[in-house]
Amino acid sequence: MTLLYTKEQKALIKLIHDVAEQELKPYVAEADRAGECPAELYEFGFDLGLHLVEVPKEYGGTGLDYETTAMIFEELAKVDAGYAITFVTTFVALRNVILAGTPEQAQYFADVVKQRQFAAFALTEPNAGSDVASLRSTAVETEEGYLLNASKTFITNGGLAQIYIVFC
């Protein structure tokens, strides 16, 4: 499939490519050895507005379309896929709240993201994999909130996140 890029998209791709090569690439090998990305690189991404790319305009984000968003993170992933996935996972989690939550929940979630925070995505379970129909986790409403009983694996962004989407 051939994509026809607009002038704006071409300029944005070049900008992201140049920034990734100059600012991100020098840290990739050390981040791989250390097993984590330096906090200042995430701050750099926040300064670029990467955390707002797929947040809808009505919630205070850029509201970029999916194609442009994909182009941005594809370009970043060419240098460091893990770095790109850290931001993308936040959008995947937010998208679930926008589609299945209330407008108030979506606004709350977007407000967390706008404060330079990451989200985690907890779907996979030891006996179910990512088969949603086979999940055993439960969330039961109590007087104090919710009681979550879950066993999850592969919680994407689990070590960085301030807000979690947990599938039950």
How should each PLM-predicted stretch be described?
Residues 1-87, 107-108:
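Amphipathic, small/basic residue-rich leader segments at the start of a protein or domain
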Residues 64, 131-133, 157-162:
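Short glycine/proline-enriched turns and hinge-like loops at secondary-structure junctions
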Residues 81-103, 129-132:
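N-terminal glycine-rich flavin-associated loop
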Residues 115-123:
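A short, Trp-centered hydrophobic/proline-enriched beta-strand micro-motif
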Residues 122-125, 166-168:
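Short beta-strand segments that buttress and anchor functional surface loops
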Residues 137-140:
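A structural signal for short hydrophobic beta-strand segments in well-ordered beta-sheet cores
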Residues 149-168:
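A short core secondary-structure module
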